[in-house]
């Protein structure tokens, strides 16, 4: 019997916390146009309002000066623009910023990573995570629910507003978004896809599809479905050169093994233009677990039929974790083996680890409503794609 991952409580509500009003951040452009049509307005009004919402991070209808007063008044009666609030901010010595963002009575974490030529925002898709990857802090928090569209795109909106207001400090505007925060995005397709549509929309944030990246641990039915819904860059959390190791550290592999996963990746690449023909492989380096030169040779053989570049990620510790970080010398030897096979191989620079904002360290504040035994069934049995 298959398990349903998306529950009734986690599907996208049309109505916000204020039961009388629709949160416009929950609507992509098609839905926004339908909303205005139902108000008796022309569809172009949706474009106007979205431009104010996303180009100027405006949440006040009275400031939308190219909208007539009558319509502004009507909008105030039936709608609102409500992004989740930042309740805590931490700044790293390397410029990385981590925001704890309130979603109801819980928190998720969003990370802003500035670089010389760009700024990347790492966005969460769920409150917690059900997949229990052993090396990841988020997985140890359990799982509560999927984020709504407004809570996903609202992270980008809130970050853009903060960075935009701080232009005098020299902070770089957001150029890239990665769905690599808390949660497994493919277990929340219903809400993740509309949020990414807004990121790509010219009346939304207007990002290139090559600058919006979704990372997955391998929910194969949902990955096949994603390719028919939207085209964005794809990264996969592989982390092991064989099924024996991956079964242990990424338990969903017991249901969708590496061969099955990579087959779905290749099918996605056939449909995608955003990836320019290759996928990004994420590989966390765990000391004497998956980081030997024999593992590097196995990985190279495993990936020879999958066009890719490989990101080696030094593991970032968290309390109670059973692993150690690979030494620089082991990472260097591993990298050289991969490059000898002709793979583009990058050792990811750790950012924000002094504020627990680095890869695998995001935890938030999660009320775990998914029992551990249920989570194990979710990993060991078929996932109902109709529920995704």
Curated annotation (Swiss-Prot):
It is an enzyme of class 2 (transferase). One of its GO terms (molecular function) is tRNA binding. It holds the Pfam family Radical_SAM. Residues 115-354 form the Radical SAM core domain. It is found in: Cytoplasm. One of its GO terms (biological process) is rRNA base methylation. The gene is rlmN. The active site is at residues 109, 359. Its cofactor is [4Fe-4S] cluster. Gene3D superfamilies: 1.10.150.530, Aldolase class I. It comes from the Bacteria. Specifically methylates position 2 of adenine 2503 in 23S rRNA and position 2 of adenine 37 in tRNAs. m2A2503 modification seems to play a crucial role in the proofreading step occurring at the peptidyl transferase center and thus would serve to optimize ribosomal fidelity. Its EC number is 2.1.1.192. It comes from Salmonella arizonae (strain ATCC BAA-731 / CDC346-86 / RSK2980). Disulfide bonds join 122-359. Its main location: cytoplasm. S-adenosyl-L-methionine binds at residues 183-184, 215, 237-239, 316. This is Dual-specificity RNA methyltransferase RlmN. Belongs to the radical SAM superfamily. RlmN family. Coiled coil: none annotated. Reaction proceeds by a ping-pong mechanism involving intermediate methylation of a conserved cysteine residue. The keyword Transit peptide does not apply. Binds 1 [4Fe-4S] cluster. The cluster is coordinated with 3 cysteines and an exchangeable S-adenosyl-L-methionine.
């Amino acid at each position: 019997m298959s398990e349903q991952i998306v529950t009734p409580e986690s599907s996208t509500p049309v109505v916000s916390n204020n039961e009388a009003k629709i949160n416009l951040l929950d609507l992509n452009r098609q839905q926004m146009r339908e909303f205005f049509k139902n108000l008796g307005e022309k569809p172009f009004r949706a474009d106007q309002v979205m431009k104010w919402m996303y180009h100027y991070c405006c949440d006040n209808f009275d400031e939308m000066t190219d909208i007539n007063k009558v319509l502004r008044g009507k909008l105030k009666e039936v709608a609102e623009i409500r992004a989740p609030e930042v309740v805590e901010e931490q700044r790293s010595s390397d410029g990385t910023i981590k925001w704890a963002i309130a979603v109801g009575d819980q928190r998720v974490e969003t990370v802003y990573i500035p670089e010389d030529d760009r700024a990347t925002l790492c966005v969460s898709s769920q409150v917690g995570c059900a997949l229990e990857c052993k090396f990841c802090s988020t997985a140890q928090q359990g799982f509560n629910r999927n984020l709504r569209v407004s809570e996903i795109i609202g992270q980008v909106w809130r970050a853009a507003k903060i960075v935009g207001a701080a232009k005098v400090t020299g902070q770089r505007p957001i150029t890239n978004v990665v769905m690599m925060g808390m949660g497994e995005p493919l277990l929340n397709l219903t809400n993740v896809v509309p949020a990414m549509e807004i990121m790509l929309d010219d009346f939304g944030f207007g990002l290139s599809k090559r600058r919006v990246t979704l990372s997955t641990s391998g929910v194969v039915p949902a990955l096949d479905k994603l390719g028919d819904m939207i085209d964005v860059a794809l990264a996969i959390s592989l982390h092991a050169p064989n099924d024996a190791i991956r079964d242990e550290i990424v338990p969903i592999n017991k249901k969708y093994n590496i061969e099955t996963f990579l087959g779905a990746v290749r099918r996605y690449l056939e449909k995608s233009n955003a990836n320019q023909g290759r996928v990004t492989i994420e590989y966390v380096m765990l000391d004497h677990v998956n980081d030997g030169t024999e593992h590097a040779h196995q990985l190279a053989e495993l990936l020879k039929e999958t066009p890719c570049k490989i990101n080696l990620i030094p593991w970032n510790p968290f309390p109670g974790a059973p692993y150690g970080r690979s030494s620089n010398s082991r990472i260097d030897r591993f990298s050289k083996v991969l490059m000898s096979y002709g793979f583009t191989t990058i050792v990811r620079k750790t950012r924000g680890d002094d504020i627990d904002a680095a890869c695998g360290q995001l935890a938030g504040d999660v009320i775990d409503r998914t029992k551990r035994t249920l989570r194990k069934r979710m990993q060991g049995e078929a996932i109902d794609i109709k529920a995704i």
